[in-house]
């Protein structure tokens, strides 16, 4: 059995760790509210852009934007992967990466090549290590991400798709469901899915200047950027939620460990006292 001093040192060490996990839990709890507000604020814009694209696509029946055309054969697939910059978020990033590797392998088994661009330090580090063909990366996105920081990596994929180098693009991120649940999501980004039935058959009374095709050309890139930005906000909210839950679990485990160590310490102290009394009694009897 360890000595009382050693056990006391272990208890002190765990208590210090608990202070850190509690602080991280409280910080994440504070940040998640702000992240949720940003996420909810941007949703109406993304939804409105989706409706506009549906109007324009239907209004310009004689013109098909390249982003709306399905390729007959998929020879190369691109993934835009969104992760966090920091760890201590449970299995949030690793679960996403594991599913993505499975999806990439499925495409490779069909004979398709795979390209990736990563957003976030964790994704960049992971996929460089597994030697995936990375064609772009951006890190240090922060808790309040800016759209401007994403435009470069988004353009890499859009240009490759427009030039016919990539036949399909997926957006991979953690969708925020609630504080306890975050879901790894794979959304097809390009070609854009067909307009919903109610959008496609609605009677829109709009005038387009100079024409629907020209407006569609300008709006389409903004729409793709808004989808990626919305996914990034969802991922940031998911990160804070996962970290809050992970740190609470760590704090609970620290409490349990401290209790167990305290019990061991009490037993060791009791044994030492018993031994000391026995020695005193034995010495007195010898006299």
UniProtKB/Swiss-Prot annotation:
Keywords: ATP synthesis, Cell inner membrane, Cell membrane, CF(1), Hydrogen ion transport, Ion transport, Membrane, Transport
Subcellular location: Cell inner membrane
Annotated InterPro entries: ATP_synth_F1_ATPase_gsu (IPR035968), ATP_synth_F1_gsu (IPR000131), ATP_synth_F1_gsu_CS (IPR023632)
Gene Ontology BP terms: proton motive force-driven plasma membrane ATP synthesis
Coiled coil: none
GO cellular component: plasma membrane; proton-transporting ATP synthase complex
TM spans (from-to): none
An MF annotation (GO) of this entry: ATP binding
Keyword hit for Ion transport: yes
Topology term for the membrane: Peripheral membrane protein
Function: Produces ATP from ADP in the presence of a proton gradient across the membrane. The gamma chain is believed to be important in regulating ATPase activity and the flow of protons through the CF(0) complex.
Family: Belongs to the ATPase gamma chain family.
NCBIfam families assigned: ATPsyn_F1gamma, PRK05621.1-1
Oligomer and partners: F-type ATPases have 2 components, CF(1) - the catalytic core - and CF(0) - the membrane proton channel. CF(1) has five subunits: alpha(3), beta(3), gamma(1), delta(1), epsilon(1). CF(0) has three main subunits: a, b and c.
Protein name: ATP synthase gamma chain
Native source organism of the sequence: Stenotrophomonas maltophilia (strain R551-3)
Gene from which this protein is expressed: atpG
């Amino acid at each position: 059995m360890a000595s009382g001093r050693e056990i006391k040192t272990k208890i002190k060490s765990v208590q210090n760790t608990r202070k850190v996990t509690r602080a991280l839990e409280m910080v994440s709890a504070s940040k998640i509210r702000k992240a949720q507000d940003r996420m909810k604020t941007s949703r109406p814009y993304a939804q409105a852009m989706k409706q506009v694209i549906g109007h324009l696509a239907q209004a310009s029946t004689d013109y098909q934007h390249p982003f709306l055309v399905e390729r007959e054969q998929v020879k190369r697939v691109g993934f835009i992967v969104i992760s966090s910059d920091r760890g201590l978020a449970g299995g949030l990033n690793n679960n996403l990466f594991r599913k993505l590797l499975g999806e990439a392998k499925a495409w490779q088994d069909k004979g398709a090549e795979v390209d990736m661009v990563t957003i976030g330090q964790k994704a960049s580090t992971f996929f460089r290590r597994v030697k995936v063909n990375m064609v772009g990366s951006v890190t240090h996105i922060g808790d309040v991400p800016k759209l401007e920081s994403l435009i470069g990596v988004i353009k890499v994929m859009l240009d490759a798709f427009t030039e016919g180098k990539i036949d399909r693009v997926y957006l991979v991120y953690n969708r925020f469901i609630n504080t306890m649940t975050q879901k790894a999501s794979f959304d097809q980004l390009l070609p854009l899915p067909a307009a919903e039935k109610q959008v496609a058959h609605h009677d829109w009374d709009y005038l387009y200047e100079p024409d629907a095709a020209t407006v569609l050309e300008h709006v389409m890139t903004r729409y793709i950027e808004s989808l990626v930005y919305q996914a990034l906000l969802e991922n940031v909210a998911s990160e804070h939620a996962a970290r809050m839950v992970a740190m609470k679990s760590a704090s609970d485990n620290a409490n349990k460990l401290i209790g167990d160590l305290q019990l061991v310490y009490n037993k060791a102290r009791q044994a030492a006292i018993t031994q000391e009394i026995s020695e005193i009694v034995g010495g007195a009897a010898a006299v």
